[in-house]
């Protein structure tokens, strides 16, 4: 087998309007052309054994996918399946085995004999492309009886996932935004995520946001400054000092006594911290561990109690968790290493942020803890004895969390909300040591030991025990309060001829109403009338360029077939889509050989229009007119034939339509001669004018444009005759 072409779709495309992240493979089956799986006994016998995920059904939340795209079973392989279909399922199963839950795909023959199109979903683009190549090679090897090495493939995919997939905190915010129909864009080569479009966009970086104060982050990052500010505000904090050397450490120990804690002055997430130090030797080691991260080291009294994390968003406490360091419990038989291995078999544990818990690693810090207790990894722990393997309770080092949100005493709740305001953070993780979070902190002699910018959400959204909390919802509420919008109006134009002219006219109309327009054409990208890029800019990346611009509040996007076939659209939905026409141009390029296939490509655009938006279609073009049958949005038609039966039928049903009456423009007030306007030019102007005349309530952000473009203005510029029936009349 040979891969002829491999494309990555990133938005609605010819292959699927609903499924956006797709790999499109064009595979030459070569000597396996017309071969089905039942003709290859080694394939049917070995593949399910090598890749058990092939036969796994999607989880309940993907139940719709189960019926449309069921798993590939060994019975089906034995009965006979096309090899393109097998490749599709193998590519999906490889990704799922590596922790990426993808299920959708399809395959069908290409125009050339022995060539198949294989289309399947991906979670991470690089992983999808790697899975495509691996799937083709794997099926080819099995068919030809070659040796199979599957583990390196899965390891590579797993590594890609760990490198590129959102962390749990970021993903919780992104998925919450997506559930509210808020679009997102991951900025190139960055962990920064843009939520929303244009002037309405907000950004997140992990759990810092567009509203996160730089001063607040700086304060939280300097633990001495944080402690001083909290102490001045009456918040209990541990007594301590800052040292830079062993001499300073000795003075601090003489002042504080044991037990003590050492931690870097500007550290975070427990890095470099050592707690409950009981002797001078360990104090020196703690100093060295902290100075890996900061020359300045905080030495402070050790506060007895359990470790709690209080999460405050936008000034309100929204979650609390009790954290426990990574630990094992002895059974009197197995070694500490064996106990660690057993804990790591918990299916909830994985590498890094892959799952809700992180696998425990016996690192140098763990070995030091064991050494201090005269233990090694080969020691057998007595039955019932609990051994803590880390000095801090971070989830990222194997710790566990129990939700205690409903137990927080009102005094402690107020304290947490005050701390957030004192430090000046919109999202704030407050670490507290106390014997019981249900008792006021001033009664337990507990203390606030640390304040964190960019706190992790994993312990709250997926606690080991207790009720999961949707802590991302308050973040999205803060970024996009009720009544606000994340979107900007998007008008998109496609067709064989007239796209650029129509786009330019629409952009001009909208700009004349005071909007800051970004538009794309075959000549370049324009922001508020200024050309920022030149060349053919009608693809998805150019659309994203406009939608990422923070000054733009209206996008008008020329959308050509090349970009749609290359990578799909640069947006998922639009407000208005205009299709001017479909002609037999560019056939034979990118596997589009018929005008009907070209119409299917162009037809992607109107299918992305929101339900209360408009698809503006040319009623004189049979293929364009037929697009209305697949649409869920409202449809407006235009025609050069004032007696068009299609227009009449549409208008009789209450639809919006525009026609050209030869030589004369009818308006509610005037009759103006347009004898010098050519028919083709006028047709394009009709297409440009229609989206702007509707009085139907659209999103408040752009309602002013729709209603402001009154018929008199349109008559002056474009010559429109608009019909709404019953009673065929000009409006």
Each model region followed by its residue ranges:
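ATP-dependent carboxylate activation and anion-phosphoryl transfer catalytic cores
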Residues: 1-179, 316-319, 324-338, 365, ...
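Adenine nucleotide phosphate-binding catalytic loops in nucleotide-utilizing enzymes
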Residues: 592-599, 603, 613, 633-731
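Short acidic-glycine loop/turn motifs at beta-strand connectors
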Residues: 197, 312-316, 436, 660-662
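Flexible active-site lid/hinge loop adjacent to a nucleotide/diphosphate
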Residues: 531-650, 686
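Active-site nucleotide/adenylate-binding loops and adjacent lid/helix of ATP-dependent enzymes
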Residues: 85, 199-364, 410
């Amino acid at each position: 087998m040979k891969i002829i072409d491999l494309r990555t779709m990133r938005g609605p495309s010819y292959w699927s309007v609903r499924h956006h992240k797709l790999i499109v493979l064009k595979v030459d089956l070569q000597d396996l052309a017309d071969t089905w799986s039942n003709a290859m006994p080694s394939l049917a016998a070995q593949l399910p054994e090598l890749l058990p995920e092939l036969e796994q059904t999607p989880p309940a939340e993907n139940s719709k996918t189960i019926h449309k795209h069921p798993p590939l079973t060994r019975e089906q392989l034995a009965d006979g399946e096309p090899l393109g279909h097998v490749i599709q399922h193998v590519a999906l199963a490889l990704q799922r085995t590596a922790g990426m839950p993808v299920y959708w795909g399809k395959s069908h023959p290409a125009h050339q004999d022995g060539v198949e199109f294989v289309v399947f979903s991906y979670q991470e683009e690089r992983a999808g492309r790697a899975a495509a190549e691996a799937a083709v090679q794997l099926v080819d090897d099995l068919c030809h009886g070659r040796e199979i090495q599957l583990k390196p493939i899965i390891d590579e995919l797993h590594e890609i996932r760990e490198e590129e997939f959102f962390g749990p905190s970021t993903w919780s915010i992104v998925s919450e935004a997506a559930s509210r129909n808020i679009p997102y864009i991951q900025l190139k080569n960055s962990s920064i995520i843009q939520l929303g479009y244009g002037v309405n966009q907000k950004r997140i970086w992990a759990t810092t946001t567009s509203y996160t104060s730089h001063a607040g982050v700086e304060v939280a990052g300097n633990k001495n400054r944080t402690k001083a500010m909290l102490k001045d505000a009456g918040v209990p904090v541990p007594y301590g000092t800052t040292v830079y050397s062993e001499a300073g450490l000795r003075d601090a120990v003489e002042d504080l006594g044991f037990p003590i804690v050492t931690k870097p002055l500007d550290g975070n997430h427990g890095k470099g911290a050592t707690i409950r130090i009981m002797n001078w030797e360990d104090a020196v080691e703690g100093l060295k561990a902290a100075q890996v991260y900061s020359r300045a080291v905080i030495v402070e009294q050790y506060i007895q109690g359990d470790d709690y994390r209080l999460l405050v968003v936008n000034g309100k406490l929204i979650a609390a968790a009790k954290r426990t360091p990574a630990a094992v419990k002895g059974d009197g038989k197995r070694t500490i290493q064996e106990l660690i291995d057993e804990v790591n078999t918990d299916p909830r544990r994985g590498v890094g942020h892959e799952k809700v818990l992180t696998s425990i690693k016996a690192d140098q810090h763990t070995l030091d803890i064991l050494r201090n207790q005269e233990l090694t990894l080969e020691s057998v722990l007595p039955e019932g004895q609990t051994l803590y393997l880390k000095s801090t309770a971070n989830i990222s080092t194997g710790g566990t969390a129990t939700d205690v949100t409903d137990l927080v005493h009102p005094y402690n709740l107020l304290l947490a909300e005050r701390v957030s305001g004192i430090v000046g953070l919109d999202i704030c993780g407050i670490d507290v040591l106390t014997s019981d979070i249900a008792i006021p902190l001033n009664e337990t002699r507990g203390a606030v030991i640390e304040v964190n910018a960019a706190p992790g959400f994993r312990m709250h959204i997926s606690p080991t025990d207790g009720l999961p909390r949707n802590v991302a919802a308050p973040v999205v509420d803060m970024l996009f309060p009720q009544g606000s919008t994340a979107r900007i109006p998007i008008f998109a134009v496609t067709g064989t001829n007239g796209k650029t002219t129509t786009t330019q006219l629409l952009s001009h109309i909208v700009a004349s109403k005071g909007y800051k327009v970004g538009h794309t054409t075959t000549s370049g990208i324009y922001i508020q009338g200024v050309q920022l890029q030149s060349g053919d800019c009608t693809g998805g990346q150019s659309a994203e360029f406009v939608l990422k611009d923070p000054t733009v509040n209206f996008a008008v996007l020329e959308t050509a077939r090349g970009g749609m076939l290359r990578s799909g659209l640069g947006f998922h939905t639009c407000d208005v889509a205009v299709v001017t026409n479909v002609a037999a141009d560019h056939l034979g390029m990118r596997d589009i050989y018929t005008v009907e296939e070209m119409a299917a490509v162009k037809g992607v655009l109107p299918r992305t229009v929101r339900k209360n938006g408009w698809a503006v279609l040319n009623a004189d073009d049979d293929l364009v007119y037929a697009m209305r049958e697949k649409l869920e949005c409202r449809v407006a038609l235009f025609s050069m034939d004032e007696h068009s039966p299609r227009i009449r039928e549409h208008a009789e049903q209450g639809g919006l339509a525009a026609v050209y009456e030869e030589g004369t423009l009818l308006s509610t007030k005037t009759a103006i001669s347009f004898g010098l306007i050519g028919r083709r030019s006028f047709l394009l102007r009709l297409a440009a004018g229609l989206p702007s005349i509707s009085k139907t309530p659209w999103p408040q952000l752009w309602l002013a444009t729709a209603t402001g473009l009154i018929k008199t203005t349109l008559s002056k510029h474009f010559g429109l005759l608009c019909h709404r029936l019953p009673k065929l009349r000009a409006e």
